[in-house]
Amino acid sequence: VVAMGNTEPLNTIDISDENLRAVKEGMKGLVEGTLSPYFRNCVVSAGAKTGTSQVRADTKNHGVFVCFAPYDDPEIAVAIAIERADAGAALASTAVNILNAYFTPNEDSSTVTGENQLLP
């Protein structure tokens, strides 16, 4: 962990257990289906959702990707938004790299990238 902010939720929403379960199952289905090539090497179970923000016909779309892990007892959420990334699925491999780095003990912390730095 390079930097740790406030871990308390800023607010909450009122959602039924049934609706929350449906959302989580949909996010798990995406990881096990369309995104399975990206999550094949993920060290932890996860739920994810892709998004694409269309801009104009003559430019690439913006990509959005969110995920959480572990699936059964979430500990971390990752959100990525990149201009002109074409589609949210294009960001899945970056999210998997973040999850793997977070959940894999690393004895050599000298390779940790500092805050506000691009990941390798």
Give short role names for the model-derived ranges.
Residues V1-L35, F39, T104-P120:
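Conserved active-site-proximal loop/helix segments of enzymes involved in bacterial cell-wall
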Residues I15, E83-L91:
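Short alpha-helix boundary/capping segments
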Residues N19, L91, A95:
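Hydrophobic (often cysteine-bearing) scaffold residues that line and stabilize catalytic clefts
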Residues V23, K49-G51, V66, V78, ...:
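Residue-level preference for non-acidic, small/hydrophobic
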Residues R40-P70:
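Short, Gly/Ser/Thr-enriched beta-strand-loop segments that form substrate-interacting elements
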Residues A57-K60, A79, A89-A92:
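Short conserved micro-motifs at the rims of enzyme active sites and ligand-binding pockets
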Residues P74-R84:
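Short, well-ordered beta-strand elements
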Residues T94-Y102:
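Short amphipathic C-terminal alpha-helix that caps PH/PH-like domains
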